[in-house]
Design a protein with these regions (language model features):
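Condensing-enzyme catalytic core mediating Claisen C-C bond formation in acyl metabolism
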Residues: 4-11, 26-38, 47-50, 225-302, ...
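Structural signature of cysteine-dependent C-C bond-forming condensing enzymes
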Residues: 3, 102-118, 131-143, 159-168, ...
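N-terminal amphipathic, basic-rich helices that act as targeting or association modules
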Residues: 1-22, 79-112, 342
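Short acidic, glycine/serine/threonine-rich loops at helix termini
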Residues: 18-19, 126-130, 182, 208-213, ...
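Conserved catalytic cysteine-centered active-site region
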Residues: 1-3, 36-94, 122-184, 217-244, ...
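Glycine-rich phosphate/pyrophosphate-binding beta-alpha loops
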Residues: 174, 317-319, 349-355, 408-415
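Conserved small-residue
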Residues: 8-10, 28, 96, 115, ...
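ACP-dependent fatty acid/polyketide chain-elongation machinery
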Residues: 1-78, 258-272, 363-378, 416, ...
């Protein structure tokens, strides 16, 4: 069993704001919203008209640049994979390549990685379009359709890119998937002999059907702000009405601190622990007690005292019930210390990147910790009077951070919290 700390030695992000780490951080600090009318999704028959859209992004410049920077054999594999992969899986694969470069991994070191992909139903639009062609043309679908409908195909493609022959698998817990994958990464390192783990919070190729289904649940912002997309995601604001879906992905490279130091690599943060609970209660209603238990478990398992915490990257999706339940859970788990914390809502700027969100927002939280500056929570024009904690409503704040929480709660009562600590 590995007893030493596990660190984040490489990261990558691709959101509608930027495909670079510092580009995303700068956009958040400037208060730029990623939310626009959908361009790549046909919204003519659905209520949901806005989101964070990467479906029409040109990936060719990044493909060429990354292929040239990677070790030659890996660059050649990336080019080969790009010729056959659909758009969203390729977007995820390019982010893995960026994380490998950020971690400074040689080809042989990357090949030692175990691969974990967070997500499920990642190819909704591809599947729906295939079903439509199948029905309209007597089975006229591509031979590769079923392969690229499998979420596990993305894990296999990451392994192929890296030349890794270790474990590669997909983990799903709805929008808590990313933190579950980080927990699995810790277990691979501590109990299963992994030298390093690559965790990909995979992009979801959202479909009109999927968006409409969320809208019918009453989960999406579809009423007041369709003509003002940048104002639609507004956690903790009095006028919030639901979340705004978005494309996006994030990657973390995890490895033992000693191995990272021996390579002379930078450690962005220590991943101390992850707490996980289930509500056994209701598919959509959030549960304060379950969330509080996840927070408490994460701190206990990570060996982090409540008093060390300075910052919470909140799940805060902009729903009327969920935003307040999360704050109540923080109070229940952290006691009076909750009043001394800074809390912000990355979804107010990015929208909700669904299965990828815990990894995407974990990367952003670590970037903020290293910058000693936290982004503001956008669109809080009338703070909900029930909010009694500091939710960074006034904009960015300077804040040294010793340790932070990254919350993610999924439909079905999946409650997760990851804890990161500054590396001294």
């Amino acid at each position: 069993m590995l007893a030493e700390p596990v660190v984040v030695s490489g990261m990558a992000l691709h959101t509608p704001l930027s495909d670079e780490l510092m580009g995303n951080l700068a956009a958040l600090m400037a208060g730029r919203s990623a939310i626009t009318p959908w361009r790549s999704v046909d919204t003519s028959r659905i209520y949901a008209k806005i989101g964070g859209d990467l479906g029409d992004s040109d990936l060719n410049p990044a493909l060429a640049a990354l292929s040239a920077r990677l070790p030659p054999e890996m660059g050649a594999r990336l080019q080969r994979l790009a010729r056959r992969l659909p758009h969203m899986p390729l977007l995820g694969l390019l982010s893995v390549a960026r994380a490998v470069l950020d971690a400074g991994l040689e080809a042989s070191e990357a090949a030692e990685a175990h691969v974990l992909v967070a997500g499920a139903n990642l190819s909704d639009r591809l599947m729906d379009e295939g079903f439509a062609r199948f029905g309209a043309t007597r089975g006229g679908i591509e031979a590769s359709h079923e392969l690229y409908s499998l979420d596990s195909t993305l894990a296999a493609c990451v392994s192929e890119l890296l030349g890794s022959r270790g474990p590669a698998f997909v983990i799903n817990g709805a929008c808590a998937s990313g933190n579950l994958a980080l927990l699995a990464g810790l277990r691979e390192l501590r109990h299963h002999g992994a030298k390093r783990v690559i965790v990909l919070g995979a992009p979801s190729d959202v479909s009109p059907r999927g968006l409409h289904g969320f809208a019918l649940l009453g989960a999406l912002a579809i009423h007041r702000f369709q003509d003002e997309p940048a104002r639609a995601s507004r956690p903790w604001d009095r006028d919030r009405e639901g979340f705004v879906p978005a494309h996006g992905c994030g990657v973390m490279v995890l490895e033992p601190r000693a191995l990272c130091a021996a390579r002379g690599a930078r450690a962005w943060a220590e991943l101390c622990g992850v707490g996980v609970t289930s509500d056994a209660n209701h598919l959509t209603l959030p549960n304060e007690e379950g969330q509080a238990r996840a927070i408490t478990l994460a701190l206990r398992r990570g060996g982090v005292a409540v008093e060390e915490l300075d910052f919470v990257s909140a799940y805060a999706t902009s729903t009327s019930a969920g935003d307040l339940v999360e704050l109540a859970a923080l109070r229940a788990a952290l006691g009076p210390h909750a009043e001394r914390l800074r809390i912000n809502a990355p979804k107010s700027l990015l929208g909700h990147t669904l299965n990828a969100s815990a990894v995407v927002e974990g990367v952003l939280a670590v970037l903020q910790m290293n910058a000693d500056t936290l982004h503001g929570s956008l669109n809080i024009h009338h703070l909900d009077p029930a909010v009694d904690l500091d939710v960074c409503a006034a904009g960015p704040v300077r804040q040294p951070v010793r340790a932070l929480l990254n919350n993610a709660f999924g439909f079905g009562g999946h409650n997760t919290t990851s804890v990161f600590r500054r590396v001294q």
